[in-house]
Regions:
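Flexible loop/turn segments at secondary-structure boundaries
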Residues: 45-47, 135, 201, 209-210, ...
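Hydrophobic, well-ordered secondary-structure elements that form the walls
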Residues: 297, 325, 382, 404
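PRPP-dependent phosphoribosyltransferase catalytic core
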Residues: 198-199, 234-240, 393-505
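Secondary-structure transition/capping motifs at alpha-helix termini
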Residues: 302-308, 327-334, 368-372, 394-403
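N-terminal amphipathic/basic-hydrophobic helices that include classical n-h-c signal peptides
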Residues: 1-32
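Phosphate/diphosphate-binding loops
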Residues: 366-369, 374-394, 435-442
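Conserved short alpha-helical segments that host acidic/polar catalytic motifs at enzyme active sites
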Residues: 19, 26-242, 248-309, 314, ...
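Short, glycine/charge-rich flexible loops or terminal/linker lids adjacent to PRPP-binding catalytic cores
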Residues: 327-375, 414-426
Length: 505
């Protein structure tokens, strides 16, 4: 087994899970948010394609990265590193010279250390997942009640989510049936890859909330969360898996194990915030969607008498929305502050809120000549707590801005995500929109009353909007309308998940 370098402490533990004994190398990490996965099945060595393919998912997490390959001796090698203080490439540069084979998978994981290596009645395999299981406690208890087994407890008392997925797979007699069992039993969202000694299983979330695409070149195939991750590696688009679709990939072919389902609910936030500008989901490019989104905002503003001197976006994801607004409105696009990109990652990644706020402030450097005495229309991808955007607004005022008009690129976030956990908020009351609703309505708010605050044509919504504006010190505030935002994708609205904005499943 390959040494783990400066990764988190590891202990190999023999034990049982589900109805079957197996051994698993376990990591003492907790947490279940976003991440990215990549796999390669090739007639030639996969090491470089795997290295760069996983690295192209670094925008989806800043905590841990992991690689696993099936080596020439038919055994699995793995390396996992903490990447919170240095980029993926610098941590894995030396490892990749020693990890060779024709099959490999890897991930960027924003807490949970992956891939896991497993030995069970199904044989040896490696697994990596993206998503969140909201009925984890129930499933764990069901498995414990059904058999004399155990789960390895991580620090903080959490059960490793991917270990639970392994337990569900091991309840069946084949890996393919085990993956189907996962899709049937979990609530939430899971997209995964399972690497055996014969090939790689890829399975998209049952409702397609997260993507999984396949690229092809002469030597073989790759599987990827992000469609842009394989472009520079010489792969061409082969197919995008549909919701719930399962495939088995070898260097020679892609075999469909389960056809896609009819119902799609892909996360709209992939376009608004998560996705890298070069990525495409369901054939819709992220950058283009953000241009469309900004254009819709501009058309709504044309009905009012707002005449800013310039349009600016909060880097990075707000920038393309602002370009779209500027192109549509004719108001000049400007960069009144610049993100210092060499060292600062996305600010929502640290677990400490004060640290996130500090990073959000430190990474933006003002351009005084573009701010002083200007009326600025500022677009951010969203408002979650509101803390960082308020501080950014105050920062603009302190730098001499005359007015700051704010246009978030999505509606007010009213519900915590049950499927991807894009925010580290522990309670819906962390969301500024919900705090304001509680301020007006008290703690016990019925769904009917809450629905009024989600409707931009109601007095309740207007009252909430004005209160948020005052609390965050904006000159004016106008959120994106849900229909306009969905229209920006060009997809049927029924294909898009809108739970965090209107609570609809």
């Amino acid at each position: 087994m390959k040494k783990q370098g400066d990764s988190d402490s590891i202990s190999g533990i023999e034990g049982g899970m589900g109805c079957y004994p197996f051994s698993i190398i376990h990591f003492n990490i907790a947490g279940l948010p976003m991440g990215g996965i990549f796999g390669v099945a090739s007639k030639s060595d996969v090491s470089l394609d795997l290295f760069f393919g996983v690295d192209y998912h670094s925008h989806l997490g800043t905590r841990r990265g992991g690689l696993a390959v099936l080596n020439e001796y038919g055994t699995f090698e793995r390396s996992i590193h903490n990447i919170s203080n240095s980029p993926f490439r610098t941590k894995f540069d030396s490892d990749i010279n020693d990890m060779h084979g024709h099959l490999g998978i890897g991930c960027i994981s924003d807490y949970e250390a992956q891939p896991l290596l497993v030995h069970s009645h199904l044989g040896s395999f490696a697994i990596t997942t993206v998503g969140i299981v909201t009925n984890k406690d129930e499933l764990v208890q069901d498995i414990l009640d059904a058999s004399k087994t155990h789960f390895l407890e991580m620090s903080g008392g959490e059960i490793n989510q991917t270990e639970l997925i392994v337990a569900l797979i091991n309840q069946k007699n084949t890996i393919a049936d085990g993956i189907k069992n996962v899709q049937e039993k979990i609530k939430g969202s899971i997209t995964l890859m399972v690497m055996t000694k014969d090939g790689i299983y890829g399975a998209r979330d049952k409702l397609g909330r997260t993507p999984l695409v396949i690229g092809q070149k002469e030597e073989g195939f790759c599987l990827s969360f992000e469609s842009h991750a394989y472009i520079n590696l010489g792969y061409k688009d082969y197919k995008e898996l549909g919701p719930g679709e399962i495939v088995f990939v070898t260097p020679e072919k892609v075999e469909q194990i389960q056809k896609p389902g009819d119902k799609m609910k892909i996360c709209t936030f992939l376009w608004i915030y998560y996705g890298y500008p070069t990525a495409c989901y369901e054939g819709v490019n992220v950058e283009q969607m953000r241009y469309n989104c900004g254009a819709y905002l501009a058309r709504r503003d044309a009905e009012n008498n707002i005449k800013p001197d310039c349009v600016a976006g909060v880097p990075d994801s707000g920038t393309a929305h602002a370009v779209g607004y500027a192109n549509e409105s004719g108001v000049p696009f400007s960069r009144p502050f610049i993100k210092y990109t060499p060292t600062w990652p996305r600010s929502f990644m640290p677990t400490n809120q004060n640290q996130r706020n500090l990073i959000a402030h430190m990474k933006l450097i003002p351009v005084q000549q573009l701010i002083k005495d200007k009326s600025i229309l500022l677009i951010d991808d969203s408002i979650v707590r509101g803390t960082q955007l308020r501080e950014t607004t105050d920062f603009l005022y302190e730098s001499g801005a005359k007015e700051v008009h704010v246009r978030p690129a999505c509606p007010p976030i009213m519900f915590g995500c049950k499927y991807l956990n894009f925010s580290r908020s522990k309670s819906e009351m962390d969301l500024i929109a919900r705090r304001v609703v509680r301020q007006f309505e008290g703690d016990d708010v019925s769904p009917e009353v809450l629905a009024k605050y989600c409707d931009p044509d109601t007095p309740e919504y207007a009252k909430m909007l004005e209160e948020i504006r005052k609390q965050l010190h904006f000159t004016t505030l106008r959120f994106h309308r849900l229909d306009d935002m969905l229209d920006s994708t060009g997809l049927d609205h029924c294909m898009l998940c809108t739970y965090c904005w209107n609570g609809q499943e």
